[in-house]
A protein has these predicted regions:
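N-terminal targeting sequences that direct proteins away from the cytosol to non-cytosolic compartments
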Residues: 1-62, 69-113, 118-123, 127, ...
Length: 167
């Protein structure tokens, strides 16, 4: 006898492990659907965005983004204050932010709506909606010239109201 022994081991196939991970990932995916206004053009966006749109206006093109993050993603105060900073305004307390927010309801549920305008810098204003869902937060943000806010606000509102979970 040479001392050689044959041993048999049963191991899971790598493909099976990979498929289990893929299936688990698919079960946890979160996808949305919406109704887009006819004049908006979907464009390739930043990798953090779920979707991006060019929103035409008389003063140029607005930039609309939809992003989603797990949890509260910094909360309303941190996000609104970041947006205020982007248009040259000072941060606000949570109490003051609540005074400038509007509560709305759409197909995805209740959300907070914001119209942020710096009267001294009208090149960029922001319309934004924050949907705080059970396990994640959805942000819809439109950066556009302040002179065009009134012209696009109805389409933005209808768009936000149309957002729902896909599937």
């Amino acid at each position: 006898e040479s001392g050689d022994h044959i041993r048999t081991y049963r191991l899971p196939k790598p493909d099976k492990v990979s498929n289990d991970l893929i299936d688990e990932k698919n079960e946890n995916e979160f996808s949305l659907k919406w109704k887009t206004p006819g004049s908006w053009e979907e464009v390739q966006g930043h990798s953090m965005r779920l979707a991006s749109f060019n929103v035409p206006s008389s003063e140029g093109i607005g930039d609309l983004s939809i992003t989603t993050f797990s949890g509260v993603s910094g909360g309303i105060q941190a996000n609104v204050n970041r947006w205020l900073g982007q248009i040259g305004l000072e941060p606000l307390s949570l109490v003051d932010i609540q005074k400038i927010s509007f509560s709305r309801t759409g197909r995805l549920g209740d959300y907070q709506y914001f119209k942020l305008i710096n009267e001294d810098q009208k090149e960029t204003a922001i319309l934004a909606s924050i949907f705080q869902l059970e396990a994640r937060t959805v942000f819809v943000k439109l950066s556009i010239n302040a002179n065009d806010i009134i012209k696009v606000e109805s389409d933005f509102s209808s768009f936000c109201e149309s957002i729902s979970i896909s599937g």
